[in-house]
Each structure stands twice: as structure tokens, then as C-alpha cells.
Amino acid sequence: MLHDTIAAVATPPGEGGIGIIRISGPDALKIAGQVFRPVGEKDWRAGPGFRMYYGHAVDPGTGETVDEVLVSVMRAPKSYTREDVVEINGHGGVLPLQRILKIVLDCGARLAGPGEFTRRAFLNGRLDLVQAEAVLDVIRARTGSSLQVALGQLRGGLSERIGAMREALLQVLAEIEASIDFPEEEDVPETRLEALAGQLAALEAGCVELLEGAEAGRVYRDGLGVAIVGKPNVGKSSLLNALLREKRAIVTDVPGTTRDVIEETVNIRGLPVRLLDTAGLRETADTVERLGVARTRDAVAGADMVLVVLDAASGLEDEDRRVLALARGKPLVVLINKVDLAPAGIDPDAVRALVDGPVLMAAIIEGRGLNELEETIAGLVLGGRVTGHHTVLISNVRHQHALEQAGRYLEEARSALVSGMPLEMAVIDIRNALDSLGDITGETAGEDLLDRIFSHFCIGK
């Protein structure tokens, strides 16, 4: 338990139906008692937790009523932080909330830092670090599938997997260290070393299995950046509007209408996809259009995937080939548009000979080909993987790097065992693997890492 009491506004700024001041710490009830005047509940602080009390927030210095409020009490350890927690629920205006917060701080609370309530939940053992990070992922989830991935981590799915791996690794370590400390009693036969190496190989395979879903998990968490590119007037903005199901971008018959990158997020088969509608790629003397073309090149460089749109009505031109060359090296989907105007205008096999990626046919204005396009994008990311209630996916780059590091240490430890190297070498690698896995769940995380993680939270969480 930490020794001071913290407070902050726990609801978003601005006007709303309800605004909440959250107080957590050993003096939460004492401080709230100086601010809150209940109606008909004289001993509310001595009552049971998980109850709400009606009354008024007042300034104890002047006796002035600040707001009409409901106060909820959650007693330690059955609270979010495992400390005494009081929440003052008032009206959601900026002024009353700030006045109540100032009074609470004047009565002895300290203003909470970013994520400090969740940090206390971690330090007090209610959450591990994976679950603490998942709290932020739940808040930021943009699709139902993204939410399910975050909730799976919040429920402890990944933590259980990592915990089981660490426990198995600790057992291997204990056996090897016993043979080092007591060589006359615990001399490890070669067959046993092979068995221990097999256990390390199984744990290494567990790391690989989790890492196989890392790219899909990252997309669920951070979104997939898809740059829509092509020469002018091939239907890029029409495609953006069709995928958004709204007229977001201006569409005309005049080439070069789009001068800048337009970014919008859409839900494609559960994936949050950031669509980047770009300026048409062509040689031009127009200064503004040239700036737009430069930004298009930057968008392609920064995108996770490139969607090249071709115009069947104009055939496959040199400009199209230059666009395809620009997208080389990126995950790529080619969409041959306007097949309603020229069904045989572009031979898809000729395009397939130029690119490494799916080539689809579409008539965007008529809505043809959109379902196949969405399925293709999702398929490239998920690779047939189905997410559900019990899916465990690595969605955090920090977790991914730690797992990769743990896998390398496990491989080195296994190699040390089977090659006859001193057992102390294997012990060093096993301990390093344990530290890498512990960084994920927080057992071995240092203050610098915690500061970096919780700095991304809002102050009231």
C-alpha cells in the first residue's frame, strides 16, 4: 500500500450528464468526509462498502454548497486500487468538478499523475502489467474485435500463458542449479540433459506460437494503415467513400481533384483500418498538386499496406507501372476498377506478372467487388486466424520484443545443454529468459519502464 492519498477528475473534460472525482488512499474516507454532507446518513463512513450516498459537496471553509452529489464508497482491498476509494459523482460541468477537486486537494489529497490509479492497482497486486496496459487498450478499442482482444488480456489470458511458461522455466532452472551446487549428489545424466533441452525447446515453441499472432494483434490494437494510390481519376476517392459508406472525399471527373492525403478509419471485418486517400501520381507543373504527390509518396512509405487502383477503361499505362513500382516491397492489393465500362480493358494476369499480391476486379460506383476487397484485406492480416472470446493475441510491441528476446535466450540455453557447454552458461541464458518474460507481466519491470507505460494514461485512470 502507498502512503499518500490521490485524487483526480475521472471523467472526460467538457459538459456531460455526470462528472466523477476519484479519491484513493488511506485518507480517502477522511478527506471525503470533510467535503460531503449526506442527507439522512450520519455515519456513512462507517457503513459497508459498495453503497452510494446522496447529499451535497460543500466547501468546509465557508459552508457553501458546491454541488448536489452521490458518493460511492469502495473499501480496501475490494476496490480498483486495493485501497480505500471514494468517488464523488456530481454534475458534469467543468466548474463544479474543478471546485470540488480543489477542495479535495485542499483537504489533504495529492493530484494524481497520469495512470496513477491503475499504477497503484498494479503495485498493490490487483493487476499485472499486461492487464494494466490492457485497460488502456479497452478504452481505445475502435472495433468489436479490437475490444475482445483487449478484454482477453484484461481477463488474464496472456498473463496465464506467460505465467505458465515462467513456472516451467523455473523448474528447469532449479534442477540445473541443484546439479551445479551439489555435483556429487545431483550429477545430471546425458539423457536428463536432453529431456531438459526438450522442455526448453517446447517453451521456445510457445514463444513462437504467441509471436505468430503478433501482427494481427498489433493491427487490432493500433490499426492497419492502407494507402490508396493510383494515377489521377482512377476512382481512389470513390473507393474511400464506398468503404466508409459516406461521401467523405470530393469526387469529380477532373484529374487531380484530391490534392492532399485524406485519412479516415473504417471497420473492415473487425479490423480498424486507417484509409489514406492520396493525390493521383503523375508528372505535373501545378505546385500544389506536386506537393500532394510528394505526400502520397510519404504515405506509401509509412503505410502497412498499399492498395493500388487501376482504370480498366484506360488500360495498363506507363503511369500505372510507375505506381506499381512505387508500392514494391509493401504488402499489396491491386484493384482494377471500372470493369463495368471496359470488362477486358486490363488483363489481370498481366498485372499479376508485375506484382506479388492479389489482383481484384471491381466497379466501385456500382458497389461491385467491395466485399471481396474487404475479405482480401482481412485475410492478408489474419491469415485465416479467427478471433473470439478466448483468443490470446500479442497486441503490444513491447510484449512482442520481450517474447522475441526470451525465445533467443531459450535457444541459446538449449544449445548450451546439448553441446556439452558448462551448465552455468545455460543458467545465465535461462535467467535472462525469465527476466524477459517477467518484463511482460511486470515481475522484473523497473521504474523507468513503469513511468513510460503509465505516462500514456489519462490522469483520472
From Swiss-Prot:
PROSITE patterns: G_TRME (PS51709). GTP binds at residues 233-238, 252-258, 277-280. Keywords: Cytoplasm, GTP-binding, Hydrolase, Magnesium, Metal-binding, Nucleotide-binding, Potassium, tRNA processing. It comes from the Bacteria. (6S)-5-formyl-5,6,7,8-tetrahydrofolate binds at residues 22, 87, 126, 461. GO terms for biological process: tRNA methylation; tRNA wobble uridine modification. GO terms for molecular function: GTP binding; GTPase activity; metal ion binding. It is found in: Cytoplasm. Mg(2+) binds at residues 237, 258. GO terms for cellular component: cytosol. Exhibits a very high intrinsic GTPase hydrolysis rate. Involved in the addition of a carboxymethylaminomethyl (cmnm) group at the wobble position (U34) of certain tRNAs, forming tRNA-cmnm(5)s(2)U34. Homodimer. Heterotetramer of two MnmE and two MnmG subunits. Belongs to the TRAFAC class TrmE-Era-EngA-EngB-Septin-like GTPase superfamily. TrmE GTPase family. This is tRNA modification GTPase MnmE.
